[in-house]
UniProtKB/Swiss-Prot annotation:
<dbReference type="InterPro" id="IPR005813">
    <property type="entry name" value="Ribosomal_bL20"/>
</dbReference>
<dbReference type="Pfam" id="PF00453">
    <property type="entry name" value="Ribosomal_L20"/>
</dbReference>
<dbReference type="GO" id="GO:0000027">
    <property type="term" value="P:ribosomal large subunit assembly"/>
</dbReference>
<protein>
    <recommendedName>
        <fullName>Large ribosomal subunit protein bL20</fullName>
    </recommendedName>
</protein>
<dbReference type="GO" id="GO:0006412">
    <property type="term" value="P:translation"/>
</dbReference>
<dbReference type="InterPro" id="IPR035566">
    <property type="entry name" value="Ribosomal_protein_bL20_C"/>
</dbReference>
<keyword id="KW-0699">rRNA-binding</keyword>
<keyword id="KW-0687">Ribonucleoprotein</keyword>
<keyword id="KW-0689">Ribosomal protein</keyword>
<comment type="similarity">
    <text>Belongs to the bacterial ribosomal protein bL20 family.</text>
</comment>
<comment type="function">
    <text>Binds directly to 23S ribosomal RNA and is necessary for the in vitro assembly process of the 50S ribosomal subunit. It is not involved in the protein synthesizing functions of that subunit.</text>
</comment>
<dbReference type="InterPro" id="IPR049946">
    <property type="entry name" value="RIBOSOMAL_L20_CS"/>
</dbReference>
<dbReference type="GO" id="GO:1990904">
    <property type="term" value="C:ribonucleoprotein complex"/>
</dbReference>
<keyword id="KW-0694">RNA-binding</keyword>
<dbReference type="GO" id="GO:0019843">
    <property type="term" value="F:rRNA binding"/>
</dbReference>
<dbReference type="GO" id="GO:0003735">
    <property type="term" value="F:structural constituent of ribosome"/>
</dbReference>
<dbReference type="GO" id="GO:0005840">
    <property type="term" value="C:ribosome"/>
</dbReference>
Length: 117
């Protein structure tokens, strides 16, 4: 029986990992053993941060809404409570977008919310 070697398969696997490690510093972009560790860690960070990004953007939207609402003499928590009472269902992403790009529209929403405080 002849010996079976995995030449093509392992070469392709090495090539795939080294391609993912392109741009890494030191031996991490040329040495397979180091590269595989760095690529695995990078993929772990990417997985974690895809979830953290959602958290970070929600915090950013809240900060923007709070800053815009304070210009009109309210606080974020009061404003959100008033929106609930006024039955205005606009999510934080849209509110933050309005606060930054359409201050007149946002001011009218604040006036509607103030009526329900």
């Amino acid at each position: 029986m002849t010996r079976a070697k995995s030449g093509k398969i392992s070469k392709n696997r090495h090539k795939k990992i080294l391609k993912l490690a392109k741009g890494y510093r030191g031996r991490a972009n040329s040495c397979f053993r180091v590269a595989i560790e760095k690529v695995e860690k990078a993929l772990q960070y990417a997985y974690r941060d895809r979830r953290n990004r959602k958290r970070d953007f929600r915090g950013l939207w809240i900060q923007r809404i709070n800053a815009a609402v304070r210009e009109h003499g309210l606080v974020y928590s009061q404003f959100m409570g008033a929106l609930k009472k006024a039955e205005i269902d606009i999510d934080r992403k849209v509110l933050a977008e309005l606060a930054v790009n359409n201050s007149d529209g946002f001011a009218s929403i604040i006036e509607q919310a103030k009526a329900h405080i």
